[in-house]
């Protein structure tokens, strides 16, 4: 569950740690930095060339913008390439000839990026360096706390928070408490999460939408649907109104809890906004529909699937759709997804999925399709089961295809499943249904020989 919270929390983390305050003419800055960034990206992995370009064309970043805005903008633009952004900071820390010290915001940004790069040691080193230079501002503390949050280090985060509270030159902010709420929520430490929220209120720092969103996400991760709903209703009543992130969280929460009516109501509220980042939400709704047999669920799911067009193949989603179509007896659609799974070399190892496929073929009387599927599934390493063979025996028997029925029995005898009482009972019933009493008696004789 904690991994799910990472996905939920990532959309808010930027709000917690973005400390840059660009000048009014930042548009020109962004354009100039973009040109430099593009040149740096063409260099590749040569650290020496990277540093040389900055030496020749990057001095203006901190000489013109002594508040750190230039370096911060370049690090922001290189943020997807964490190691390059950190190289910029390393170069900046080495520029000592101009007597322009790093700002606390540059340290905060470096700490944040080091955390995203999972380099906790570097983040702590930068924090300690800032401390030696008396630059331990709230943003620097918050950045290191967010590093611990991002990496699930609750004890370290709490220890740093206690140190933060002892400082006389700076004090925790609402961002600080948001981080605490987040880290506890991610680790299912609900009581600690609630205690952090209560302390925020005691120190009379007004919570913001991010605070409530992290609370909702924490309750959702812990599957505490009642408190999730109560927090949402509190937002609707209080001074902090729900934002887009809140509605998306609630949509996911309703989907995960199987509350389809509320999920659909929430989707109507935000469906025009579900687009660029629709994937996780849409997939959550698809999962919710797959778990409950509701009217028109196939049509609803296919409408949602149209929003995912162009996305990469997801094995788990494809298997989920195989089971859905099997349960609804949509054999053609089921086989389309099965073929896709074979093409993508997806290996199904759940008996429940196989039984759903078998049942669909049985209800639709598609024994030849079933036989073909079994051959392909066996070659692809899918998990076979005894029910699969029994279904083939039953279907061949119902169609008076006794030679093929007996062929399946012989095939089954050579597998690890072997022949059991039920196998013979199915054969006996098949023969009797068609008035072939003597053949049924022969099968009974075989049973006796096997001691069944």
UniProtKB/Swiss-Prot annotation:
Annotated Gene3D superfamilies: Tetratricopeptide repeat domain
The protein's UniProt keywords, in alphabetical order, are: Repeat
Q: InterPro entries in the record, alphabetically?
A: Pentatricopeptide_rpt, PPR5-like, TPR-like_helical_dom_sf
Ranges: PPR repeats: 137-171, 173-207, 208-242, 243-273, 350-384, 385-419, 420-452
Could you tell me one molecular function GO term of this UniProt entry? mRNA binding
Query: Where is the signal peptide, in residue numbers?
Result: none
State one Pfam family annotation.
PPR
According to its UniProt record, which protein family does this protein belong to?
Belongs to the PPR family. P subfamily.
Its protein name is Pentatricopeptide repeat-containing protein At2g30780
Q: Which organism is it from?
A: Arabidopsis thaliana (Mouse-ear cress)
